[in-house]
């Protein structure tokens, strides 16, 4: 059988498993690359090559640094300080919550940020006689959009970066995502404050699933044990984070991104901000293995021509010489709609290699197409299962499925329009 057909069959099975989640996402990705090796599509040396990719190392290091922020109490301290200064008026409080959440989500786990701030926000809302639902939905929204500002802010950013690397193409810089992430954050915050908040229901707080919140906090590296926090370690973790970000911003040749991240992670453990086991626990291993596995799948699609076959089919459906702006908008919609019902990490991993092939088939730069796919996967606001932050606020906010639809659909459309306008400015076709 033709190797391209074999690759497409493996991809189809992986897509089905990603959507249904009959088995864990990471297991699906690793099984896919293993199958490609067994079936002779990939040589043995390339089957698990994704695990040694520098982007995987970068992501692992930043996971540990982010976990240190939560474990030392730094993230919570920042959140409490900012939110309390905003007072108890609903709109200023909402603005403060969204801004601090965006900032924290850009450099750490957005799931951990929500889990960390949610109890604080509920307490303030109850004291101020404000319905928690009015502030919890903006919290989830801000966590989603904040992750789009840096490469490590959200898994889809890492996925699209890795896809470019696997294809041997120029890749995105660490802060390059800010060109679209910051404008989108500003637009979404302003929309929420002036228009979107009117769609957020005013409901009595539901029962907080303390186990779910605790699990999310622990996954991000927060202890959740209520133990006193060391201010010294808070300062140390903050200095380490700032130092790593500064090194990345300077783009030092002797200290590439992944080396800076690992150096910071080592310092977090050596200085006692995290114990060794806590550092391991702070890493999102699902994202690591899913990303590494799909890198090999992407390589197989490029090597066998399977990606080109899919791309040619899509382009032919849109007619000869399709407008790259229209094509980007269509791919944004596909990615965004798909993410409403499956993991944004999985949808980005599934679509990234296809996006590269489509861009190359029409003679366009893959960067704007990949950026649109990644952003679309992160800007999924319309269902409670689209992203972990959406799910976390579901119970405590007392939200229904339709509440997410009413609030999220306009934001998805706004994100589409803004992305189609902004992305080509910084990444021309």
What are these regions (language model features)?
Residues 1-60, 64-66, 177-312, 328, ...:
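Hydrophobic transmembrane alpha-helices of multi-pass small-molecule transporters
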Residues 6, 65, 128-141, 146-159, ...:
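Juxtamembrane and boundary regions of transmembrane helices in multi-pass small-molecule transporters
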Residues 13, 27, 34, 38-130, ...:
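Membrane-embedded alpha-helical segments and adjacent helix-loop junctions characteristic
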Residues 14-23, 100-109, 141-152, 246-253, ...:
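Transmembrane alpha-helix interface/packing and boundary motifs in multi-pass membrane proteins
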Residues 27-32, 110-117, 137, 149-153, ...:
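Hydrophobic alpha-helical membrane segments of integral membrane proteins
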Residues 29, 60, 98, 119, ...:
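Residue-level recognition of transmembrane alpha-helices
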Residues 44, 132, 174, 257, ...:
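Alpha-helix N-cap/start motif
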């Amino acid at each position: 059988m033709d190797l391209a057909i074999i690759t497409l069959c493996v991809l189809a099975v992986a897509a089905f498993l990603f959507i249904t989640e009959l088995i864990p996402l990471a297991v699906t990705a690793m099984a896919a690359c293993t199958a490609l090796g067994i079936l002779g599509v990939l040589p043995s040396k390339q089957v698990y090559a994704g695990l040694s990719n520098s982007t995987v190392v970068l992501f692992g290091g930043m996971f540990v640094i982010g976990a240190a922020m939560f474990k030392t109490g730094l993230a919570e301290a920042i959140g409490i300080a900012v939110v309390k200064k905003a007072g108890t008026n609903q709109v200023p409080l909402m603005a403060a919550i969204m801004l601090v959440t965006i900032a924290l989500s850009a450099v750490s786990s957005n799931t951990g940020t929500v889990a960390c701030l949610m109890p604080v926000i509920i307490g303030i809302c109850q004291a101020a006689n404000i319905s928690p639902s009015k502030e919890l939905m903006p919290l989830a929204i801000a966590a989603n959009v904040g992750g789009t500002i840096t490469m490590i802010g959200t898994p889809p950013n890492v996925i699209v970066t890795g896809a470019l690397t696997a294809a041997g193409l120029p890749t995105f810089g660490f802060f390059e995502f800010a060109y679209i992430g910051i404008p989108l954050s500003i637009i979404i915050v302003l929309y929420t404050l002036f228009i979107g908040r009117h769609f957020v229901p005013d409901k009595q707080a539901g029962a907080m699933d303390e186990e779910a919140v605790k699990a999310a906090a622990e996954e991000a590296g927060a202890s959740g044990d209520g133990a006193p926090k060391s201010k010294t370690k808070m300062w140390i973790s903050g200095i380490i984070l700032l130092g790593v970000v500064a090194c990345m911003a300077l783009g030092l040749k002797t200290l590439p991104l992944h080396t800076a991240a690992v150096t910071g992670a080592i310092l977090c453990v050596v200085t006692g901000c995290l114990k060794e086991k806590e550092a391991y626990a702070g890493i999102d291993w699902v994202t690591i293995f899913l990303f590494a596995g799909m890198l090999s799948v992407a390589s197989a699609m490029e090597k066998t021509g399977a990606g080109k076959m899919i791309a040619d089919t899509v382009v032919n459906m849109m007619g000869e010489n399709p407008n790259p702006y229209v094509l980007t908008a269509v791919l944004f919609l596909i990615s965004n709609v798909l993410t409403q019902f499956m993991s944004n990490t999985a949808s980005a991993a599934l679509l990234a290699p296809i996006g590269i092939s489509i861009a190359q088939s029409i003679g366009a730069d893959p960067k704007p197409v990949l950026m649109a796919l990644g952003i679309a996967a992160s800007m999924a606001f319309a269902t409670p299962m689209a992203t972990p932050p959406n799910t976390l606020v579901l119970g405590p906010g007392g939200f229904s499925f339709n509440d997410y639809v009413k609030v999220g659909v306009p934001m998805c459309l706004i994100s589409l329009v803004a992305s189609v306008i902004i992305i080509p400015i910084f990444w021309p076709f």
